[in-house]
């Protein structure tokens, strides 16, 4: 049963991102289409701080080297210290609405040259940036220069997948791991064309060669990073991929239609009740919750929406008065692991949690009117 637990109201613009601090489960960051970020204390359900981090919609919030990272349509990626002062600003290409991905000290973004391609950066703890891969053409890797006939077209063809729409990193036990790369994850990229490509990033270790008999006389050889193709699926073609999720290490994808694909072997195709799948979230690794552009949230046989005051009786009038869903995420039980023995600060947080009856997991849904609703699951 999905029941409303509480509502967070401080944003004046459409909610664009919701991010739970992985270090402190009651510390929440929310962002909107104006570039404003609000830091919430969930134990009291009040803002602790807010700041104008960007000048346009925020597309990604994450963490790197224990610092908050944000990415916006204003063509910048920023890293913030504990006082929320910017310690590093990186120009980026945000012509599309794609997110970016962070894994360890690596940053994976749409290429600065071409929104269809990928760049990969390494950011060290001193905030030094190294570009490992530049303007990588995923289409060429998949098709090796071949031209693909567009489904539903007559004689026309294309030579790319269009812009990157969404990216998702999924840790997997099936990825081939060698002493050369130590990679245990797949980077899935969803495109405007409807194609989804899974890539393995290879980061070869530097080799040390002795050029003479003297063991102190050595040469360090750095080999280039590269991508290896692990997966390609075109079931969504010609509809753009707009959301990617993870179901027990298996990719799940949604598009502008009512089709959801579970990328198992063989794939499973689900026909949903509504088109325009805004978000898919994983609940307890074996269940999915779906959110749609029209504001509906679906969990199994349960379907709910948040309506504005009704002024009309027709279905068309009612649909116009439904809150539009803009972001959805889940706060999982695993995030409570940072609360250990009930001593000191953790004891205080546990007491506040008990008083406020804040029990995970919670589903958080952000809406076009700036409100964020928390649902018990």
Swiss-Prot record:
Give the UniProt record's GO annotations in the biological process aspect. chromatin organization
What does the sequence similarity comment in the record state about its family? Belongs to the WD repeat ASA1 family.
Per the record's keyword annotation, is Repeat included, yes or no? yes
Q: Where is the signal peptide?
A: none
Name of the gene this protein is made from: ASA1
Where is the protein situated, by its record's location annotation?
A: Nucleus
SMART domains according to UniProt: WD40
Q: Is Nucleus included in the keywords of this UniProt record?
A: yes
User: In which organism is this protein found?
Assistant: Candida albicans (strain SC5314 / ATCC MYA-2876) (Yeast)
Q: Where are the WD repeats?
A: 10-50, 53-90, 230-262, 263-303, 342-377
Recorded hits in Pfam families, A to Z, give: WD40 (PF00400)
On subunit structure and binding partners, the annotation says: Component of the ASTRA chromatin remodeling machinery complex.
What this protein is reported to do is described as: Component of the ASTRA complex involved in chromatin remodeling.
| InterPro entries associated with the record | WD40/YVTN_repeat-like_dom_sf, WD40_repeat_dom_sf, WD40_rpt
Principal location class: nucleus
The identity of this protein, by name, is: ASTRA-associated protein 1
Q: Which Gene Ontology CC terms are recorded?
A: nucleus
List UniProt keywords, sorted A-Z: Chromatin regulator, Nucleus, Repeat, WD repeat
């Amino acid at each position: 049963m999905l029941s409303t637990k509480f509502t967070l109201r401080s944003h004046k613009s459409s909610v664009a991102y919701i991010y739970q601090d992985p270090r402190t489960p009651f510390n929440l960051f929310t962002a909107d289409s104006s570039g404003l970020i609000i830091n919430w204390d969930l134990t009291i359900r009040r803002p602790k701080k807010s700041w104008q981090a960007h000048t346009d919609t925020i597309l990604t919030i994450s963490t790197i080297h224990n610092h908050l990272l944000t990415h916006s349509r204003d063509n910048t990626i920023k890293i913030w210290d504990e006082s929320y002062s910017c310690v590093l600003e990186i120009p980026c290409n945000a012509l599309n609405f794609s997110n970016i991905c962070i894994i360890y000290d690596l940053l994976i973004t749409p290429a600065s040259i071409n929104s269809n391609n990928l760049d990969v950066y390494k950011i060290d703890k001193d905030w030094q940036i190294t570009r490992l891969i530049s303007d990588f053409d995923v289409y060429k890797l998949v098709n090796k220069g071949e031209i693909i006939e567009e489904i539903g077209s007559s004689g026309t063809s294309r030579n790319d997948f269009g812009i990157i729409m969404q990216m998702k990193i999924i840790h997997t036990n099936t990825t081939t791991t060698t002493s050369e790369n130590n990679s245990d994850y797949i980077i899935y990229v969803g495109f405007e064309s409807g194609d989804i490509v899974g890539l393995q990033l290879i980061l070869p270790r530097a080799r040390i060669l002795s050029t003479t008999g003297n063991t102190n006389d050595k040469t360090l050889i750095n080999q280039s990073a590269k991508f290896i193709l692990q997966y390609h699926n075109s079931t969504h073609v010609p509809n753009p991929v707009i959301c990617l999720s993870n179901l027990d290490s298996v990719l799940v994808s949604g598009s502008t239609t009512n089709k959801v694909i579970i990328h198992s072997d063989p794939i499973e195709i689900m026909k949903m009740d509504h088109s325009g799948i805004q978000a898919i979230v994983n609940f307890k690794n074996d269940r999915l919750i779906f959110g749609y552009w029209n504001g509906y949230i679906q969990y199994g046989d349960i379907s709910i929406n948040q309506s504005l005051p009704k002024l009309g009786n027709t279905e068309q009038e009612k649909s116009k008065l439904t809150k539009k869903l803009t972001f959805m995420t889940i706060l999982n039980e695993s995030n409570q692991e940072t609360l250990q023995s009930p001593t000191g600060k953790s004891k205080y947080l546990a007491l506040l949690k008990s008083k406020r009856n804040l029990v995970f997991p919670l589903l958080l849904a952000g809406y076009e009117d700036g409100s964020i609703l928390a649902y018990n699951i």
